[in-house]
């Protein structure tokens, strides 16, 4: 880990920013997040998206590799890994059958494109990491904490706001947020780096409060309702005053009117939503971080795909 300095008044150690800035950088990529953005960038601008002359879909491969190379060029990482979801039900879906049940069906030509992409990544010797029963976000959270424990800085590439809960610049973790990885037609719009200030400007809360924020107001994109009747503005107001969900419920007597009633009725919903939103840092993954060091490509794997 980067060095810390200790102040003379025995206050907590302060991270040494100069040491952190020279620490090796690991880029962690939310594979499905970038893949879907790549797919829809071209599907919307071209009827049927990109294809080879023989009809093989290539929107995902083209857009993903294009963005990957641009991130590598701009960030110059020492190591990289990409996490993908798996087809198996996750522990969240087992706990709640309605979790992500609002998602539209995956386009038919997306899956073969993903398969070809993962073969391309294998040829580039970039680790593709999955964990059945867990989401890619959980894999990324676990990898990020393993990486900082081994002295890396970490930048997570994703368009999923759930990953904002990982942001901790004092530990060396930021998110390269794909608010618009592509413009219409595939023109590149680069990711924006999110630290504490950016997350707070976007959501109104700090990264450490993201889980409790979503526990209160829910997350429609994942079909998580949160506490009925508590919207984003109320969630932000409560967290600014009480800091955490637990503190809010410990202070119900000081909360008046309809908000108090909604919180009382929705306590179990808040706890359930928090369980669904919280990323796991103990995801079982079978990889040594040394395997994430950048390596040369494997021509024998790449040739049949090009």
Specify the residue positions occupied by each region the protein language model found.
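Noncatalytic, basic helical substrate-engagement surface that gates or grips nucleic-acid strands
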Residues: 2-6, 17-157, 161-184, 188-189, ...
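Non-catalytic nucleic-acid-binding/docking modules located in mid-to-C-terminal regions
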Residues: 2-3, 9, 17, 21-23, ...
């Amino acid at each position: 880990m980067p060095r810390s300095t200790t102040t003379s008044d025995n206050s907590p150690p302060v991270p040494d920013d100069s040491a952190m800035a020279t620490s090796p950088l690991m880029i962690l990529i939310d594979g499905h997040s970038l893949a879907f953005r790549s797919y829809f960038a071209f599907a919307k601008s071209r009827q049927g998206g990109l294809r080879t002359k023989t009809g093989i879909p290539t929107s995902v491969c083209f857009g993903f590799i294009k963005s990957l190379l641009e991130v590598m060029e701009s960030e110059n990482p020492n190591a990289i890994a990409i996490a993908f979801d798996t087809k198996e039900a996750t522990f969240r879906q087992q706990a709640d059958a309605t979790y992500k049940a609002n998602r539209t069906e995956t386009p038919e030509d997306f899956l073969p494109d993903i398969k070809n992409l993962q073969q391309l990544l294998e040829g580039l010797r970039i680790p593709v990491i999955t964990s059945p029963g867990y989401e890619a976000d959980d894999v990324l959270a676990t990898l990020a904490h393993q990486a900082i424990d081994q002295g890396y800085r970490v930048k997570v590439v994703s368009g999923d706001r759930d990953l904002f809960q990982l942001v901790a610049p004092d530990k060396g973790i930021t998110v390269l947020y794909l608010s618009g990885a592509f413009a219409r037609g595939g023109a590149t719009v680069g990711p924006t780096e999110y630290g504490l200030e950016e997350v707070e400007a976007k959501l109104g809360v700090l990264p450490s409060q993201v889980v409790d924020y979503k526990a209160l107001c829910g997350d429609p994109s994942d079909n998580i309702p949160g506490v009925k009747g508590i919207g984003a503005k109320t969630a932000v107001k409560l967290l600014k005053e009480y800091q955490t969900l637990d503190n809010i419920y410990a202070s119900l007597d000081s909360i008046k009117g309809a908000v108090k009633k909604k919180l009382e009725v929705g306590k179990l919903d808040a706890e359930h939503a928090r369980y669904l939103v919280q990323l796991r840092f103990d995801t079982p993954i079978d990889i040594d971080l040394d395997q994430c060091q950048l390596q040369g490509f494997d021509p024998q794997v790449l040739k049949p795909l090009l």
